[in-house]
């Protein structure tokens, strides 16, 4: 039942974004925030981080990103850059929770944030090889399934 509700929610978000698909103002945002350039990639990471920090739910932000990708408003590299930003933005919840906490709790939140930031910086510089690898593997897996389908 839980998985069904998740997919139902994704369908609802997809349908909501289909109505905005033709909006020029909405599409301009994603033309500016396109992960094809270094600047655009950085902007996508910042957008993902800010949106996730505001709504304080990386799952909801990821659902929105998936819905935008399904509708075709953003491409795969842009969605990956947004998800990298969401990875940093999700740490704001831990930071906010430790505002009136002990020193050790603040240290744990700081380490959590730094770990995610370093992971995103690491992936930021490996971004293009990662995208190429995923595209290659996706095509490779599809060709394997096509071959198996022909054999069966």
PLM regions and their residue ranges:
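Catalytic cores of large soluble enzymes that bind and process phosphate-bearing ligands
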Residues: 1, 5, 17-21, 57, ...
